[in-house]
Design a protein with these regions (language model features):
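Glycine-rich phosphate-binding loop of ATP-grasp-fold ATP-dependent ligases
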Residues: 1-6
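PLP-dependent aminotransferase class I/II
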Residues: 9-179
Length: 179
């Protein structure tokens, strides 16, 4: 299944996040729902399984992912729009998303990767504002230029801490061949 974690040292940020994870519960207790939330808590068994993973994440995995990011970034600089992380921030790099020049270039790269047997993903084929959940909202049907553009051009490459250098090079070569 899916899971996640949010780390912050800011109580102003942490409090609403905790609330969202418990059905939007407010300070008044169980039935004091102050926002729309969901049940996003882990049970004890899931937490026990994930605890060693947190240690690996801190000890090795983020650094290993960062090395892949740096290698991808050097290979694609000036050819595709590469992701960045703002100064003072750290990314766990769950995905490595690139932006092609246009949809045609993105589709050509994605097809070439598929043909080469290299997994890739278009995580956001439909902009969030165009999803059915928002069809009844007042803004539905409006154009959100940046979101529309991003969804038309983005795709993601394999990203994990155990991606061997030879695999990274195969991915890089396949993307560059498609350009």
């Amino acid at each position: 299944g899916d899971g996640g974690a949010i780390f912050t040292d800011d109580d102003h940020t942490a409090d609403p996040i905790r609330s969202l994870c418990v059905h939007g519960k407010g300070p008044g207790g169980k039935y004091d729902n102050v926002r729309v939330g969901m049940n996003s808590r882990l049970d004890a068994m899931q937490a026990a399984v994930l605890l060693p993973k947190l240690k690996a994440l801190g000890d090795y995995e983020i650094d290993a992912r960062q090395q892949v990011v740096e290698r991808y970034g050097r290979a694609f600089a000036g050819k595709l729009t590469t992701p960045f992380v703002a100064e003072g921030c750290v990314s766990a790099w769950a995905q490595y998303a690139l932006l092609a020049a246009d949809t045609a270039q993105r589709d050509k790269i994605v097809a070439h990767l598929k043909e080469a047997g290299i997994p890739n993903m278009i995580y956001y084929p439909t902009p969030q504002h165009a999803l059915p959940v928002f069809w009844d909202e007042p803004h539905y049907g409006e154009t959100f230029r940046n979101a529309d553009d991003y969804c038309a051009r983005t795709f993601s490459l394999p990203m994990h801490p155990y991606l061997e250098q030879a695999e990274q090079q195969q991915i890089i070569d396949a993307v560059l061949e498609a350009l």
